[in-house]
Structures are given as structure tokens and as C-alpha cells.
Amino acid sequence: MRGVSAHGLSHEERRQLAVDLTRVLAHYRSILDAYIIEFFTDSLWGTLPHSWQEALDGLNPPQLATLLLGMPRDGEEMRYRSVWPLTLLALKSTACALAFTRTPGFHTPSEFLENPSQSSRLTAPFRKHVKPKKQHEIRRLGELVKKLSDLTGCTQVVDVGSGQGHLSRFMSLGLGLMVKSLEGNQRLVKRAQHLDQELLKALDKMEKRHPKMVQRGPRHRPHHVVQWVSPTTLCEELLLPLERPGQSSARLLLTGLHACGDLSVALLRHFCCCPEVVALASVGCCYMKLSDPGSYPLSQWIAGLPGHELPYRLREGACHALEDYAERLHKAEPGLQTHCFRAALETVIRQVCPELRRPGVQGIPRVHELKIEEYVKQGLKRVGLDPQLPLDLAALQAHQAQENRVVAFFSLALLLAPLVETLILLDRMLYLQEQGFYAELLPIFSPELSPRNLVLVATKTPLGQAFSTLETEDN
């Protein structure tokens, strides 16, 4: 899917985009607010315009990926079996036009062509214990942070919410940056320190075997600290420099790789409030965990717009992986029936216990191998109801026959979900600009590998033309 690039939009154009987004999201709120497990209990199919029902009814999953989501296979032509209503075409076009583009600006051969488990752009020691998705992420974000650090004259990088320290390790031992690594979980910090030691030994061995292949010079391992960072109060530890007293004052760059919920907001507030922090590179995630109010909206502009509210359901939907779901549709994966089965189970739960709504059902394994009545019995047991209740098999089979309708409705909601993410990230950019700073948003990861792939880059002085270097892929 194409979209709008945040980079290059003027401040006024960003404000107008916020106006357009709030209007569109308010117009389609009924689709975004719906829970797919209530497809049958709330007759969600009947809430769609009749002309939409006619256009979408009977489309199989691959057709939904191509025609509705607008994500055809390479070389595939988009052929509509009927004339779609203008209102549905308008929804599709609007969802595409107003969402921030998720396509990176670099065009290089895949780093996983030779081996799907090993990035060809990382040396073996940095790949150990790191999954392919994370290999891609730490390399791309680490290289951007290095460039941003050089451009802004930073003396220290602070990696907030660092987990097992994969990004910190690559930035310090791979790129030569001075890195402080903050993580609230002591167990993860101990694991990170163990992996640091393991990597140092591996690099020493590599240097002895291949002295010309390994960069010589001092190695700065990351400085790990067990520290919880609050979104509402300043963290003194975050601001403490690693340099010895007497040296020039530190210039800090804050970064966070998929900083969860309020943690992303904490990074923004530290950037705005602390003179020592001169740059920011943050990739957010888990928007449903944002405190409301407090973490959205942040900008005065969006707070003043009617319809700006984003309840939990909308923020949760913004965390789905559009590209991954489109691929599942193209493959017509058997697992697509899970939403239909769960919605059918909800009808039985409501009949037996009307006050029990949308209870959590722990993942039932191998759903695609079960008959719908078998799934329902297992589901009843998991929510504490009698699995031996007599079932209306004809009604369950009638629900199962509507599986493609369930998938179509879910696809509609997923088509709109990037607009919610766009509004959240746009709010953060406008907030930074309202404080007098400079903010841009870049698609940094391949969305097929990492769905939350937009990095918020902020500086306190304009980068000008130098900003374009952040978008390029290193050789």
C-alpha cells in the first residue's frame, strides 16, 4: 500500500492531515469499534451498507487481499468481478491516501536471501541468540542512530527498555558508540550482561583468526542499569553521563526499539524537558497500553479536534500486522477460520450465560483440524462452562458457512487500522513541533519483517539536507 510521507509535509499540512484523519475515523467508527468475536451476536455483517455486502459477499481470502486491501501478488492484475459502490472504493482510496507510508526508501536485495535465519549484513557474533526479525531491526535502527549521533554531536546513546540488550550490544560493540542501557527487569539485565561477555569472547577469537576482518580499537561494552522509566516523572539515572567528572557536558541521544505503550511517551517527555538530550530515535508499539488520558493526545492541536478520541479497541487494532495478514489471505491459510469459530462460540456463551461477554479464551491448538462443534466444546470448558451442553449443530454449521464474511469484515477493519497508527504518531510529531523542536517519521524496517516499522526522529536543531542520509541504506 502506498501512503503519505511525513517527511516533506509542512507544519500546516500535518495539522490538516490530523483534521482529515479524525473526520475519517469518526465516520467509520462503527467498523473500527466492532469486536470480530461479536460478528454473529451483534449481526455485524448487517451493519454494512447493502451495496458493500453485495460487493464483498463471496470473495475468497486471496481476492480480499488483492481487491480490498489493495495488496496483489507481484504481477497480479486487479480484476473486479462486479462494479464496486463508490462509497466502498472511497473507503479504500482514503485509507491508502491518509496513512503514513510503510515502505522504506531503500531498495537493496534482501539480507535473508541466502539464509532466512541469518542476516548477510551482520557478522556471525552479532547474529547469535538473535531472531531474524530482531537482526534486521537492530541493524537498521543501530545504523540510523549512529548517523544521527554523528550529525548531532552526541557523546552518549541511552537505550531505554533495552530488554536483553541486542540493540545496545550492536551499537556499542559493533558501531563503537558509548551506550547506556536501561531496563526495568533485573532478570533481563543479567541476561544482557551474560550475552555481552559471550560476544566479547567471540570477537576476540575472530580478531585472532582474522585480524584484518575485525575493526581494531577500544571496545566499549554497554553500561547496563536496572531502571524503570516513568512517563510522568524525570529519570535522573537516564541523564547521568558515562564520562568522568571534569569532561565536557554530555550530549545524549535517546532511543527505544519498540518501546511499549507509555515508555515511548516517556522518551518524548525526557527529550523535551532535558537540555542534555539533543536527539531522539524512537520506534513505538503496543498503542493499546497508552494511558488515557495522559499519553494521547499529547499535542494541543489534536486535543482540540472533535472526534480525536481513540478508545482501547481502536488502539489495539492499530497494532495488527497488515502485510502479514494479507500474506495469510493470499495463502488462504486454514487458521483464518479461527475468527469465525470464536464468533460462533460467543453465540453459545451468550445463550448459556448472557452476562458473560467476550471472555478470554486461551489459544486452542490446531483449530484448523477441529470440527466447529469440537472447538465450541473446548472453548466452553476454557471459560468455565459445561462442555457437554447440547449444541445446535445446524446453527453452528450455518455460522461456519459465513467464514468468508467474517474474514471480509475483519479485513475492512484492518484496512482502516493504519489510520489510527498514523494519528497517534502524527500527534507525537505535532507535540514535538509545538515545543519548538524538529520531528520526522521514517519507515525504517521492512514491514513484512517488522510491522511497527516507523521511527520517530527528533532533534533540537534542524538537520536540513543532512536528514536525507538517515533514509539511506549503508553499503
UniProtKB/Swiss-Prot annotation:
Keyword Signal: no
Superkingdom field: Eukaryota
Transmembrane parts of this sequence: 406-426
Membrane protein topology class: Single-pass membrane protein
Pfam families the UniProt entry points to: Methyltransf_32 (PF13679)
GO cellular component: membrane
Coiled-coil segments on the chain, per record: 185-209
Localization per Swiss-Prot or TrEMBL: Membrane
InterPro entries given in the database record: Methyltranfer_dom, METTL25
Main location group: membrane
UniProt entry keywords in alphabetical sequence: Coiled coil, Membrane, Transmembrane, Transmembrane helix
Record-linked PANTHER family: CGI-41 METHYLTRANSFERASE, METHYLTRANSFERASE-LIKE PROTEIN 25B
Similarity section: Belongs to the METTL25 family.
Protein name in the entry: Methyltransferase-like protein 25B
